[in-house]
């Protein structure tokens, strides 16, 4: 091959056209990569939210069924406990529930069933290190969901018919990634009759609009999200909080 042929090939119209086309492809791929980098985190977050909805709804259903069976066999929960020792009564409460649950790990009042460190408020600020508390009974279900049983008030034995006597905290996330109220950590109240997720329509203790608002910085913000997740099957309060409410839109799409 001669030098003239090489020069002619390098600068031929066909060669230039091919080079330009490859450049366009590379530019297009670069744009696609940038767009993917921008959108993938949002898509992953939405997928994680859907998984959380499924897991929390399942935990709620499992606990409701366990409570129903426990009452059928043992009567009202006030008959299970003495009312004299809050810690001992919490243990009896949790172990009674446990009989009707599939449990893979029982931590009792010890650490190990929850992430270490402080749980975060919905706005990201620290709240409490629940894994180190010694007054709440912890266990992990077969699907990895962690539970914490707690008798809330000193008059839990005589709490009124539809008022909460205690709570069951539900952790749906990964222990290695920490935990946050309203994202993977939720509260269910139990009364003499039923289990009720916090933040429901008539909740005066932790109403959704005040205690599940990512723009609010109040203490315990995020504790009022459970009912929204269970009944509306979304976590859109993380995306359009100003639009949502029990008397307003139930999702960002409305």
Label each residue range with its predicted role:
Residues 64-83, 102-106:
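Alpha-helix exit/C-cap motif
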Residues 16-48, 55:
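N-terminal single-pass transmembrane signal-anchor helix
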Residues 1-20:
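N-terminal leader/signal peptides at the extreme start of proteins
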Residues 86-254:
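Intrinsically disordered, low-complexity regions enriched in Pro/Ser/Thr/Gly and acidic residues
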Residues 40-63, 67-70, 74:
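Aliphatic-rich helix starts adjacent to a transmembrane/signal segment
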Residues 8-9, 28, 68:
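Short amphipathic alpha-helical "recognition" segments used for binding
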